């Protein structure tokens, strides 16, 4: 390939890349939406497959697009920053991001407190309310939240709670309990089939698993929870201050 040909190819590639970026910025292709196939883009832009492939590969490397094996190439959802030291409910978190929140309950039941009695400081023969929800930010699934709430401390919480209500608001209004601190641990977890379905990700895709114990104004445990979120959808920020 001559120097002139290489220069011409680079111009075509840069033009196609920019046009794809412009289409994404203008909402032609929205977050989570599949872009046309390489063949379709070749026809649309009247360029070779090599040019299209390079433009797409660069946008994948930049985190603008994501390839799903066997499915195609999709517009990557914008990452959400989550400060690890923030103690707030999901509704407050959505407000801080300037985005609409929604939840879908996928499981709720009374279960034995035995696996959680030490963390919650409750008798092993008591019960907890298990609440599992998919949490959405601007209609995109952000994470799965599984919580276990001690019914010995918050009687009939499972009957008071209705889908869409804020659990932290219920704690405060019905039980005079304010969540003021929590302890979190983080590890990486491979997405199971049900998690992949709800989070719209690949089976085995890396997820952040954030395990949490929340405490009230009297330093008593309020609930334990596990959050599973796609590692490529969220940025975790640790803000340390020296006193």
Swiss-Prot record:
Domain of life: Bacteria
Pathway entry: Carbohydrate metabolism; fructoselysine degradation [regulation]
Gene name, Swiss-Prot/TrEMBL: frlR
Keywords attached to this entry: DNA-binding, Repressor, Transcription, Transcription regulation
Role noted for this protein: May regulate the transcription of the frlABCDR operon, involved in the utilization of fructoselysine and psicoselysine.
PROSITE patterns listed in its UniProt record: HTH_GNTR
Limits of the HTH gntR-type domain: 10-78
DNA-binding region as annotated in the record: 38-57
Organism: Escherichia coli (strain K12)
Protein's name in the database: Probable fructoselysine utilization operon transcriptional repressor
CDD domains associated with the record: WHTH_GntR
Induction: Induced by fructoselysine. Makes part of the frl operon with FrlA, FrlB, FrlC and FrlD.
